[in-house]
Amino acid sequence: MAKIDIFNLPKPVMQTGVAGKKLMFAGTNDLGKSFQSARFPKPLLLAAEAGGSAITCPQIPIDNWSKFCEVVKQLTADSTKAQEVYQTIIVDTVEELVSRCEESVCRRFGVADISLVQSADVKKNPNGYSYARNQFKQQVNALSNAGFCVIFITHSEENEVTDPITGETFKKLFPFGYNKEKSSNRFVCNLCDFVFMLVPQGVDPETNKTILSKAICKETNRAFARSRFTQMQTYIEAFTAENVTAAIEEAIKKEAENAGAGLVEFTQVNHNFNRDDYFEMLKPYIAKLAPLYPEYVAKVIAEQLGENRKITSATEDEVAELGAIYDELSDFCCSRGIVVD
C-alpha cells in the first residue's frame, strides 16, 4: 500500500490555471452565475435547481441524491478519460444539492424530516444531520479531488454582524448557510480555493442595458469573499469567465514569485487506493466491528456491494464502493470512540 512517501515528496510548486481549482459564485438571482460558469472550458452542469433552460452546455438534472452519486462515480472512476470530455463541473446550487442529500437520508430511515432521525444507537437511527453531512462530504470531496475545475453556485443572504473592534452593527452579505457552523454549505465554502460574491451594478443609462455584475474576490466590511492566494485582486469589475480566469492566473503567478516557488501546469497526481489497498485497510475494521455490530456491518456492505456480498468479492470496478464502506466504518468508530488496531 505504498501510495504516499513522506520522505520523497516533490519540491513545492504552484499549479497555474483553473484546472483542479474549486470556485464558488455566490449572489442573488440574475447576476450571471450559471451563464458565466457555463462559459468555462468543457462544462457539465449538475442542475440540482431547476433553471438551466437558458444554459446551452451539457447538463444533468439532479433530482435525487443517488443520481449525483452515480455522476460522481462515473467522473472519478477514470478522471483522466472523463476530462477529455468535461473539464469544468458546475454544481447549481449547493443548497439544493444539500436538500437532495437530506431527502435521501429521510427516505432511508422512513421519516418526513431529517430532524426526526435522532437516535445515536446504531440499531435504531444515527443523528440525521451528522449522517447527511458525512454522506455529502464524501461525495463532494471525491468530485473535488478528481482534477476538474469544480464551480459551486449558491445564493447569498444578508446577516447582521458586529465589528469586533468598533462595536458597530451592520448588514453583510454571505454565501447561503455560511453562518451555520456545521452546515454542509459552510463546508463547501471552506473547501473552495476562491469564493466570489457577486453584486449587481444596475443599468447603463445611455444604453438601457444591464451592466455586468461585479465580483468581490476578497472579504470587505459588507461582503464575505475569500481566496487561498494573498495576491488575488479585491474586485473584478466585470464578472465574466475570461476575467475570472485571468484574475486567478495572475494571483497564482504573483504568489509563486513571492514564495520563490515553481509554476507548472496542472497535473493529476494519483493518491487513490486500489482494491487490494482497501482489502487491507478494511480488515481491522471488520474484525473489530463484526462481532459487536454484525447487522450494521452487513447493512453497510449490502448498501454498497449488494445483498449477500463479501468485501473480498468486490471487483476492480467497485473501488469507489469499497472507499464508501471504509469511510462509513471509520466514521462510525471515530464517533463512538472505538479504537481499531
PLM-predicted stretches and their roles:
Residues 35-37, 142, 187-188:
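Hydrophobic/aromatic ligand-binding patch that stacks against planar heteroaromatic rings
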Residues 70-73, 77, 138-141, 287, ...:
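Surface-exposed alpha-helical segments enriched in charged/polar residues
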Residues 4-91, 95-100:
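Conserved P-loop
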Residues 43-45, 150, 195-197:
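Short, well-ordered beta-strand core segments
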